[in-house]
């Protein structure tokens, strides 16, 4: 995190302040515990900024722990991606990376302890039967017929589960709590199930795996976590979190705190639905710039600083709300307006021939990289007899409000001369193919000598020296603010979320590094694509427009 970024405040930090003041804790230890079954998204970034930010501000520690208890859905690819995302966002974890699988031996021992205390039993109900016996919010659950097995029988069966003597789905270990509890999570939850799957960390050592609610709290305690922070959907699970720790022999007793998850307009956060977008090829992979994944946002041109600023602006509360997508765009727009160098690119070109400019002549102009930051220097831009301008920057006729090039009138070329349109050529379909102009030789960097006013300024590139580029215009992935609420969210995909143009860019951009951000003058903010772009075939992604023009 940048030293210039201000320290936020929220209810969790207020709790921490009180805990330190009262002596409840002498230091702060948080953790970020993703499951490695997908790519991190902007919602995870909020949690990363919260947990790692707290550790930084309180000179504490934050662990990166992979909650890897579901081997069938997890992959080392996701582990590496998550590590890269955390570091790219500007954070680093304390000490070694932690894995819940590091604790499988201890978790097994704690499960045995619960059995020995008569607080866990091996159940042979099917998953459907367990669901049926659990009841509902209006009806209490009912006890499994296997609930009152002896401790000795449960220990023997659990050992046989570990030794692979049972098939998947035929038997499990459940906590013995209260089937009449008003909280369904406390109605004898499953804490171990059988999975014959190779684990990316432990291989084939285990064929039984602990459930999240059993693993999570014990992992926190073993790591000495002082403040276990998660989103509101785990609020009821706090009762199970506390129950497990209160009923095993363990020194540390962390406390769980909940905050509202991020809900962002015009996108979705569900891993299942994001995976559907990828598998159904509705997007081009997890790092598609339209995706809310950290890798997708990064590829689109969002900076780590802009994401951190967004997370700071939206704050941390217990109130569920929908954040405007424009808030995220505002953060990157502010960042790039301040820090991105300027460049010129023409997305829909039409040729301009300056008839009174010498053929073959190449003039090297020095153009400022940033209008308000002279320390960012200048770049060399070649000026030639033939240039490209945007088709939309010329009209044969126009009213006074149109401040661009009009037949018979003048306009200034950015960083160059004043030109006047004198005549045009069209093809058989009536499309303008060439605009013939003349230029005022005395207007480089100064106003016309006779005092006439030239109000408009347009961008351009040299037709001879510019480089062709594929320019991808990305927009919001969905046409409705809350697509997640729809029965079929895919029906609301924005057909114009990606529009590709074949344009031209000034030659200085050929050497730009991947992910480098620029303001294309008068067009928007763009970056070099970090996957497809090469010096021989440039690809630029639109990060955000110069202003918010979305109408929904």
Curated annotation (Swiss-Prot):
It is found in: Cytoplasm. ATP binds at residues 35-37, 41-47, 231, 261-262, 269-271. GO terms for biological process: glutaminyl-tRNA aminoacylation; glutamyl-tRNA aminoacylation. A motif ('HIGH' region) lies at residues 34-44. InterPro entries: aa-tRNA-synth_I_CS (IPR001412), Gln-tRNA-synth (IPR004514), Gln/Glu-tRNA_Ligase (IPR050132), Gln_tRNA_ligase_bac (IPR022861), Glu/Gln-tRNA-synth (IPR000924), Glu/Gln-tRNA-synth_Ib_cat-dom (IPR020058), Glu/Gln-tRNA-synth_Ib_codon-bd (IPR020059), Rbsml_bL25/Gln-tRNA_synth_N (IPR020056). Monomer. This is Glutamine--tRNA ligase. It comes from Aliivibrio salmonicida (strain LFI1238).
């Amino acid at each position: 995190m940048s030293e210039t970024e201000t320290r936020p405040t929220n209810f969790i930090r207020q709790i921490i302040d009180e805990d330190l003041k009262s002596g409840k804790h002498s230091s702060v230890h948080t953790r970020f515990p993703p499951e490695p079954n997908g790519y991190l998204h902007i919602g995870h970034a909020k949690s990363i900024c919260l947990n790692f930010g707290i550790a930084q501000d309180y000179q504490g520690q934050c662990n990166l722990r992979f909650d890897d208890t579901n081997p069938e859905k997890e992959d080392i690819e996701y582990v590496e991606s998550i590590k890269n995302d955390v570091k790219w966002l500007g954070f680093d974890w304390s000490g070694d990376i932690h894995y819940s699988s590091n604790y499988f031996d201890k978790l097994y021992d704690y499960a045995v302890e619960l059995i020995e205390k008569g607080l866990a039993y091996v159940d042979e109900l099917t998953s459907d039967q367990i669901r049926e016996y659990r009841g509902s919010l209006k009806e209490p659950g009912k006890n499994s017929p296997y609930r009152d097995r002896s401790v000795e029988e449960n220990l023997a069966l659990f050992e046989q589960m570990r030794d692979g003597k049972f098939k998947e789905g035929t038997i499990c270990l459940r906590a013995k709590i209260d089937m009449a509890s008003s909280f369904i999570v406390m109605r004898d939850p499953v804490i171990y199930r059988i999975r014959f799957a190779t684990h990316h960390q432990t291989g084939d050592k285990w064929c039984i795996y602990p459930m999240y609610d059993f693993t999570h709290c014990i992992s926190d305690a073993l790591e000495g976590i002082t403040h276990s922070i998660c989103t509101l959907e785990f609020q009821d699970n706090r009762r199970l979190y506390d129950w497990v720790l209160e009923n095993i022999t363990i020194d540390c007793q962390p406390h769980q705190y909940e905050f509202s998850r991020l809900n962002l307009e015009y996108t979705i956060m569900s891993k299942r639905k994001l995976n559907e977008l990828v598998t159904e090829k509705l997007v081009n992979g997890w790092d598609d710039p339209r995706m809310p994944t950290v890798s997708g946002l990064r590829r689109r041109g969002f900076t780590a600083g802009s994401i951190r600023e967004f997370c700071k602006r939206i704050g941390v509360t217990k109130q569920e709300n929908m954040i405007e997508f424009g808030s995220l765009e505002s953060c990157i727009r502010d960042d790039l307006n301040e820090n991105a160098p300027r460049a010129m690119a023409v997305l829909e070109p039409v040729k301009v021939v300056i008839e009174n400019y010498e053929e073959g002549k190449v003039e090297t102009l020095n153009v400022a990289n940033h209008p308000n930051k002279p320390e960012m220097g200048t770049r060399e831009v070649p000026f030639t007899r033939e240039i490209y301008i945007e088709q939309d920057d010329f009209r044969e006729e126009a009213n006074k409000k149109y401040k661009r090039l009009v037949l018979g009138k003048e306009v200034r070329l950015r960083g160059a001369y004043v030109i006047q349109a004198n005549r045009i050529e069209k093809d058989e379909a009536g499309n303008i193919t060439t605009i013939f102009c003349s230029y005022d030789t005395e207007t480089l960097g100064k106003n016309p000598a006779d005092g006439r006013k030239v109000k408009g300024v347009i961008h351009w590139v040299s037709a001879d020296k510019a480089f062709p580029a594929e320019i991808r215009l990305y927009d919001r992935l969905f046409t409705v603010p809350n697509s997640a609420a729809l029965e079929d969210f895919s029906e609301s995909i924005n057909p114009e979320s990606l529009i590709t143009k074949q344009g031209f860019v000034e030659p200085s951009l050929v050497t730009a590094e991947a992910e480098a951000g620029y303001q294309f003058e008068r067009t928007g903010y763009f970056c070099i694509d970090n996957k497809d772009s090469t010096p021989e075939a440039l690809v630029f992604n639109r990060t955000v427009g110069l202003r918010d023009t979305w109408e929904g």
